[in-house]
Curated annotation (Swiss-Prot):
Its main location: cytoplasm. SUPFAM superfamilies: SurE-like. Its cofactor is a divalent metal cation. It is found in: Cytoplasm. InterPro entries: SurE (IPR030048), SurE-like_Pase/nucleotidase (IPR002828), SurE-like_sf (IPR036523). One of its GO terms (cellular component) is cytoplasm. This is 5'-nucleotidase SurE. Pfam families: SurE.
Amino acid sequence: MRILISNDDGVNAPGIAALHQALADYAECVVIAPAEDRSGASSALTLDRPLHPMALSNGYISLNGTPTDCVHLGLNGLLEQTPDMVVSGINLGANLGDDVLYSGTVAAALEGRFLARPAFAFSLLSRLPDNLPTAAYFARKLVEAHERLELPPRTVLNVNVPNLPLEHIRGVQLTRLGHRARAAAPVKVVNPRGKEGYWIAAAGDVEDGSQGTDFHAVMQGYVSITPLRLDRTFNEALETMDGWLEGIF
């Protein structure tokens, strides 16, 4: 089996090295990742300039593009053999609830949705790498176990691992996405020449972290696994809107 590994923290990030090391003796792994940190890139594709893959001394491929660019090229001709699976991560930082809309880590996995096997996105709830071995352990276990799992086509499994040593993890839970409140206001800055600018501020506080959500699971010390799909159709709204257009046109 061939696995394409990518991330959004960049090709030199410790998380992708930990993920590659965890999977290297399980499958043939190819790493294609952004040349620099592209956190928050979501599913952006680069359309205004050419992409230039560059082979690194460790065998990884660095790309001057987004996480989705990396997987897109990896599945569509850059490699001699098409990968069987896409695994993204290990992200340093949570991808919970609404975070999945912005996450390059999750987007890289979503770009692998066309393959027969489920794609995975792994995140550790820390900006520090100390507990990457915990996340790598669960990455290996879950990727190995996918062969016993029958899922609908185009399923992505979003996995968030608490920032704990392995022996302190309480277990694994299947979850739904929670929700955040509106993000904090952007932070205004002024450069020495008087030009104003803004930094995007912190994500919103947890609004729905009730039992059954990914937020609740990780706060209780459990690894959270949330199945995702691309279809964002709001079916309940469709039912509510039934007949609405007839009264307008």
